[in-house]
């Protein structure tokens, strides 16, 4: 079988960040009866479901550690490796940090797919690492029933510049650096519904590096930051609100969307992860049409950064984004929490 004819997505039951275990199930898995080990230098653990762990070295610098891997979301091996690596490195940028090295995680069905195809996957990962200015310094591989690839990434950040997902404030405006709809468009492609003019759009977005996050971290008015991945905009925004004790009002029309995404949702191109996300976070939403719900719950792979920004810092954030070719528009705002109101309201 040639590398050009291979369709990697046929060899896995899930795709990209849509492979994630649902938040409700994950909570059961992570629940522990053991006494919590307390380390005062661990600035960010898993209590707030943040993007990465952060450890204070005590010298003004903190280490960021993260890992992310998944099954193919595209058929091309090189693109799969590049997307998986870009997605993993994004967690460092989402914490406001700078990546310094990565190691690869590879699961490969050696009796089904050739090592040459696996090499193309790792080459895609290596390419993304070079884009981020880091080495792919090693890794680990196993014989697995389905192809899996990703990275464990280490980064650094000035301790005072760490950006968490739980430190937003009422009054902050919300910004999203990439359009939604990655799960929808990749599902439309699998269902042979994708129009020629939309071919490759999702791949291009997934391969965009969230490198701007390190620059956003230098802006005092950026109060919180996270990347939007497998739990969709609703999930990651809900976690931001829960961590800060605020509620969100979102302007649906202002949300950046991939071309054709609303049409494909109406045609049924909705990934399975969408329903899992709604089952976990739907009780936090206000009333809205099914099509809106399906987009907000759409699992993103290598999605954009979600920023909570004080109004006085809006112009600086937009100017910084423009330096990276990103045009930002506010998609909503955070307001004080009030009982009896949905955590995320759509206008």
UniProtKB/Swiss-Prot annotation:
Catalytic site: 17
Where would one find coiled-coil regions in this protein? none
What are the record keywords, sorted?
ATP-binding, Kinase, Magnesium, Metal-binding, Nucleotide-binding, Selenium, Transferase
Query: Its Gene Ontology molecular function terms?
Result: ATP binding; identical protein binding; magnesium ion binding; protein homodimerization activity; selenide, water dikinase activity
Q: Where are the transmembrane segments?
A: none
Q: Where is this site: Important for catalytic activity?
A: 20
GO terms for biological process, alphabetical: selenocysteine biosynthetic process; tRNA seleno-modification
Entry binding sites for ATP = 20, 48-50, 68, 91, 139-141
Q: How is the cofactor bound?
A: Binds 1 Mg(2+) ion per monomer.
Effect in UniProt of substituting residue 18 to V: Partial loss of activity
Catalysis performed (reactions): hydrogenselenide + ATP + H2O = selenophosphate + AMP + phosphate + 2 H(+)
Q: Which CDD domains match?
A: SelD
Q: What is its EC number?
A: 2.7.9.3
Top enzyme category:
transferase
Answer whether the UniProt record assigns the keyword Membrane to this protein.
Answer: no
Any idea which positions bind Mg(2+)? 51, 91, 227
Q: Which cofactor does it need?
A: Mg(2+)
Source domain of life is: Bacteria
GO cellular component, as recorded: cytoplasm; cytosol
* Outcome reported for the amino acid change (mutating residue 17 to S): Complete loss of activity
Assembly information from the UniProt record: Homodimer.
The family classification in the record reads: Belongs to the selenophosphate synthase 1 family. Class I subfamily.
Write out the function statement from the record: Synthesizes selenophosphate from selenide and ATP.
- Kindly provide the name given to this protein in its UniProt entry: Selenide, water dikinase
Protein source organism: Escherichia coli (strain K12)
- List the taxonomic lineage: Bacteria, Pseudomonadati, Pseudomonadota, Gammaproteobacteria, Enterobacterales
Gene for this chain: selD
């Amino acid at each position: 079988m040639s590398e050009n004819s291979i369709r990697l997505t046929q060899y896995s039951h899930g795709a990209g960040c849509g492979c994630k275990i649902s938040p409700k199930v994950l909570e059961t898995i992570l629940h522990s009866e053991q006494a919590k080990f307390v380390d005062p230098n661990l600035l960010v653990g898993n209590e707030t479901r943040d993007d990465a762990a952060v450890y204070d070295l005590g010298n003004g610098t903190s280490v960021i550690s993260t890992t992310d891997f998944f099954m193919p979301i595209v058929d091309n091996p090189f693109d799969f490796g590049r997307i998986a690596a870009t997605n993993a490195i994004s967690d460092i940028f989402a914490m406001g940090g700078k990546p310094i090295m990565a190691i690869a995680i590879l699961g490969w069905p050696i009796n089904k797919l050739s090592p040459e195809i696996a090499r193309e996957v790792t080459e895609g990962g290596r390419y993304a690492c070079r884009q981020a200015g880091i080495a792919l310094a090693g890794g680990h591989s196993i014989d697995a029933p389905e192809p899996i690839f990703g990275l464990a990434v280490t980064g650094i950040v000035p301790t005072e510049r760490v950006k968490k997902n739980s430190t937003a404030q009422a009054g902050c405006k919300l910004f999203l650096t990439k359009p939604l709809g990655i799960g929808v468009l990749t599902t439309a492609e699998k269902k042979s519904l994708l129009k020629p003019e939309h071919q490759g759009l999702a791949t291009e977005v997934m391969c965009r590096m969230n490198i701007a996050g390190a620059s956003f971290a230098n802006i005092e008015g950026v109060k919180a930051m996270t990347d939007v991945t497998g739990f969709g905009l609703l999930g990651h925004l809900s976690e931001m609100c829960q961590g800060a004790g605020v509620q969100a009002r979102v302007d649906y029309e202002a949300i950046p969307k991939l071309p054709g995404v609303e049409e494909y949702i109406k045609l049924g191109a909705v990934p399975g992860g969408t329903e899992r996300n709604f089952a976990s976070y739907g009780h936090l939403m206000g009333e809205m049409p099914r099509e809106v719900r399906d987009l907000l719950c759409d699992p993103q792979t290598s999605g954009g950064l979600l920023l909570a920004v004080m109004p006085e810092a809006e112009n600086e954030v937009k100017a910084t984004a423009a330096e990276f070719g990103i045009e930002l528009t506010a998609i909503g705002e955070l307001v004080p929490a009030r009982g009896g109101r949905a955590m995320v309201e759509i206008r």
